[in-house]
Amino acid sequence: MARAVGIDLGTTNSVVAVLEGGDPVVVANSEGSRTTPSVVAFARNGEVLVGQPAKNQAVTNVDRTIRSVKRHMGTDWNTEIDGKKYTAQEISARTLMKLKRDAESYLGEDITDAVITVPAYFNDAQRQATKEAGQIAGLNVLRIVNEPTAAALAYGLDKGEKEQTILVFDLGGGTFDVSLLEIGEGVVEVRATSGDNHLGGDDWDERVVTWLVDKFKASSGIDLTKDKMAMQRLREAAEKAKIELSSSQSTSINLPYITVDADKNPLFLDEQLTRAEFQRITQDLLDRTRQPFQSVIKDAGISVGDIDHVVLVGGSTRMPAVSELVKEMTGGKEPNKGVNPDEVVAVGAALQAGVLKGEVKDVLLLDVTPLSLGIETKGGVMTKLIERNTTIPTKRSETFTTADDNQPSVQIQVFQGEREIASHNKLLGSFELTGIPPAPRGVPQIEVTFDIDANGIVHVTAKDKGTGKENTIRIQEGSGLSKEEIDRMIKDAEAHADEDRKRREEADVRNQAETLVYQTEKFVKEQREAEGGSKVPEDVLTKVDGAISEAKTALAGTDIGAIKAAMEKLGTESQALGQAIYEATQAEQAAGGGAGGADGSSSSSDDDVVDAEVVDDDRENK
């Protein structure tokens, strides 16, 4: 049975984990790190870089480097590079493809199945887009799981039979969730969830960038926001400063040659940022986490004192101000320190993959829908069929009627959100039920059914009870991709994977050829410069010289076939040279051995060959 992995597809970093003997293991990437930056870059030579290599070259390739694309999932965002438009799904798929490759390399087998996590507060369009990204990357997405639920699963499975209430506070690079869960006897049940899809560590970084821009403008009069390269350097410095301030009271931000003045003199940026100042400029961001926390406590119908454990998830929770706020809001409860906030979500996803594959037994995951679902009814009102925090999968039906006499059709508009007026919520999709027989208003019976699957993806059916006629919609308009577009993107991704493989193979062939040329050239030179002259005839060396020259010519070109052929020829000539040297050495030793037998001084010959495999033969010959 093929293995399934768990993937935390993050805004700033992503992680992949797999079950090994029933235990989850976080897989290190090809660079040796357990987290992979969610950064994709298109190099000017056509190569696509993903992860740390992409992040490393961001300053010199600003316009062709894409980060934090998770914030655009489920929207019509796209970016154009070399005349081709890329959607958020395609960019995310690049990160997923790298994680898939790294996991395959670790396991030594192909991977097709995955559980991918999303913020609990992701709407239907964002979930659908995440699933599409997985498909483009060549993955069969077994399940879309909420990040806090995955974290609770990873945290809570070994906590015994006693039922416990766990609060998961998840502040990542671009999204924020807070969820309340109950765990006991192998059941993980989400009681309530809330959050903000546009709040995360990136926002803290931007505040530091703005602070630096203002400071530099005040001292030099130059506005760095007009310089893309300078802004990229500022973002990287801001992220580094934020991380340092989690363990230090102050940090130095020193960026030499950040720009030049009117006289083309280089200017330096050198600022000292204290933790107190950092907390002052980001206080309002921190305060935005309070309302979702209070909503969850209210929706779950519990008091703060009922919380048994607090789990912090996401790298941004390492900021001291965040953990202090959580402690304050939970009545002084210390957050659990035994969980790695960067890895726990991927670990939970791997466990859920194990549950779905039958590798992990006796675990039941009961997740919830984060937002209410309903349709627009007369007067533009949002009529909710499924309330937020309803356990999924779920199915609800309600009967509606027509608003006008002899109305031949009804338009069903599906919305997600908490506002009373439908247009203030997110329109997920719409469809029409036609062919309703003429009748006075209020007579036709139209049954509308909402069905949410375990991934949190919505299906809606409208049925005329009188005629039995029905129409169904699977909500996917929000992601902006049709099946044809997804199929095209999958083919594109596969083509690029072949290109990448080809490029790697070409690089390997070049490296092998260059190494062979260098070693052979060195060998020939040593022979010619040897004391007493070369042991082999000059015509053998000349043949090798010719093969070296051919290999160098091939390496100067772009034809990999020619390089392979030249390398093969050079390999053959090198072997002939090695054979000639071996035979010459043997002949020399044989002559030396004969002389040694005559005068009784053969010890030096034996010393020369003491480590060689031919020693015993040599002694037998004597």
UniProtKB/Swiss-Prot annotation:
Induction: By stress conditions e.g. heat shock. Residues 494-511 have a biased composition (Basic and acidic residues). One of its GO terms (molecular function) is ATP-dependent protein folding chaperone. Keywords: ATP-binding, Chaperone, Nucleotide-binding, Phosphoprotein, Stress response. It comes from the Bacteria. Belongs to the heat shock protein 70 family. Acts as a chaperone. This is Chaperone protein DnaK.
